[in-house]
Amino acid sequence: MENYCILGNPNVGKTSLFNALTGSYEYIGNWSGVTVEKKVGKLKENVGQLIDLPGTYDLSPISKDETVVTDYLLNDSFSGIINIVDASQLKRNVQLTVQLLELNQPIYIGLNMIDVATKRGIKIDYHKLMKKLKTPIFPVVARTGKGTKYLLGEIKHLGEGYQPHFKINYGEKIEETIKNMCQIIMTETSHDKYQARFIAIQFLLNNMQIANELNSEVVNKLSSLRDQVAEQVGAVSVRREMERIRNHYIETLLQDVVTYPDEDKQYFSSRIDKILTHKYIGMPIFLAIMWLIFQTTFTWIGTPLSDQLDAFIGGTFTDSVKTIMNYLGVIPFLQDLITDGIIAGVGSVLVFVPQIVVLFFFISLLEDSGYMARIAVLMDRIMESFGLSGKSFIPMIIGFGCNVPSIMAARSIENEKERLTTILIAPFMSCSARLPVYALFVGIFFKENQSLVVLSLYVLGIIMAFLVSTVLTKTILKNDNAIFIVELPTYRVPSIKTLWRSTWEKAKGFVRKAGTFIFGGSVVIWLLSYVGPHGINVNINQSFLHMVGSFFGMLVQPLGFGTWQAGATLVPGFLAKEVIVSSMAIIYSSGDAGLVNVIQNQFTPLSAYAFMIFILLYIPCVSTVAAIRKETYSWKWTALAVAYPLVTAYVLTFIFYQVGHLFV
């Protein structure tokens, strides 16, 4: 099967095009840093495989995700490249295009966001550009799918009759050096003359990954030639001279291809940014938007829908299942397991799906509109005080959905110590798995202020992340403040299709977890409540679950929720935070009183908020721990990522409850 790779600058629509060409769905957002590892999909019509590579501005990598690109181009086999460029930012995008053309591999250029360019008054004669580059160009709008069907039909012809042709003349002295380098590379390695020229050019540009691909003897010979030409070039470095020549080539290439409107025209994005990124009013606007989202999620839309679903699962559905099992003569043990264990456990989590969907819809709306990138800029000013840059806030925002992709997104951070710090604080972000816990307790104890209480927990998670990052960056991960440079995407009206797919994929992951982790956890919790030292079908106070819960309940007694029931829910919470709710449903619903009544009797508003603080901050779930181990390559850092949140959660919850108890 033929392999094709898709390449481009960050946030030019690579993943949108990938989804359109493969029919799959990968996470997209109107901001940079979404793709941090290569993703493989099967092209429609069995054309071949398409590999979506992380966005990069240059083939000389400075971050872990950019390393993936250069490594793939040098070491993997592929039939051609699809270079997607932003038509509204063509001059900057062509910088990467030129480097890819120097590979002298079959290439198609996808001219994306042609609609945005047109709205800005930018006119591009892509036919003329195609003739100049001698490379096929396909105008597309990846977000809507316009032009992608034609591109798909042409991909199978990519490389047919291809003859390497692209070459920039870097001047007599540098070209002579490139020629000598090529001879060494072809003699000492298996690369052909075209690959050798690309390697020589990248070596002269100080691409360290290229140097790492060669043996030390070849590197020494090439370094000697580079030093010689550096003396010949004079005061200007070889790299700077080559970049000057390349920039001149690009300007000449585009001068009669692209026509720009009046430069004095101020775009809509710029006018809006003056308000949304304002250093004084930008943050209050962000908090107000988040309050509106939570108000909609927990008061206006989400909760009423959840109540209806809860009534259906706990009433009609459960009664129907009981009737069917009685008719079939199912033994009492299985009946209890299914109704009191599986339906009670899994159902207690599924009732929050409407709230999850509403929340994900609005987060997807903020992402696709381009607003999320502005939040990173806004937070950069604050995060400098805590030893981080705004680039760390991008993975943190992703953590509102799930902490696992949040940790993986830290690959886009160039500075290794800042990347590691971001990984260690990312689990403090309130992921969707914690939301059912919040929803359950705010619905019982804080009915009039549900959105404000949940917002306070999200803000608390961010504050704790900042405080911990301060400690880390001043002690074991000392680091100079990094400069944060980010491209602000154009504001756009999100498409209904994109919003629906994004919301559905996120919600689907939540439901899928209900069918795996939560299902398994519910069965185990119910069995532990069913079995005890004295046999089976024991009173829950004589069960193994009571024994385990009593031990942990004793440990958290100073935190305000030291019952055996609360203690028993904390252990399976390591598996997945949603299991906390399913465990409560099984434990608290085992008696005559309902779940809500029992929680009201065993918690107060103060202890309920203390419990939510503890759930927010304590041990990350097992999937997050696995992601931390994968990204840090260290059991030491993984152990720290498990231990310090537990200590932090205990200390902060203890202080909150004990101080609050003095006033309540």
UniProtKB/Swiss-Prot annotation:
> Which positions does UniProt annotate for GTP 3 binding?
52-55
Q: Report the main location listed first in the record.
A: membrane
Classify the protein's membrane topology as the record does: Multi-pass membrane protein
Any one GO molecular function term: GTP binding
| Subcellular location as annotated | Cell membrane
Q: Which intervals hold domain FeoB-type G?
A: 1-161
Q: Name one GO cellular component term.
A: plasma membrane
Transmembrane residue ranges: 281-301, 342-362, 382-402, 425-445, 452-472, 516-536, 544-564, 567-587, 608-628, 637-657
**Presence of keyword Cell membrane:** yes
Its keywords, alphabetically, are:
Cell membrane, GTP-binding, Ion transport, Iron, Iron transport, Membrane, Nucleotide-binding, Transmembrane, Transmembrane helix, Transport
Give the binding site residues for GTP: 112-115, 141-143
- Which PROSITE patterns does UniProt cross-reference here? G_FEOB
Residues that bind GTP 2: 33-37
Q: Where, in this chain's numbering, is GTP 1 bound?
A: 8-15
Spell out the family assignment given in the record's similarity comment. Answer: Belongs to the TRAFAC class TrmE-Era-EngA-EngB-Septin-like GTPase superfamily. FeoB GTPase (TC 9.A.8) family.
Q: Which NCBIfam families match?
A: feoB
Q: What is the documented function of this protein?
A: Probable transporter of a GTP-driven Fe(2+) uptake system.
Q: What name has this protein been given in UniProt?
A: Fe(2+) transporter FeoB
In which organism is this protein found?
Answer: Staphylococcus aureus (strain N315)
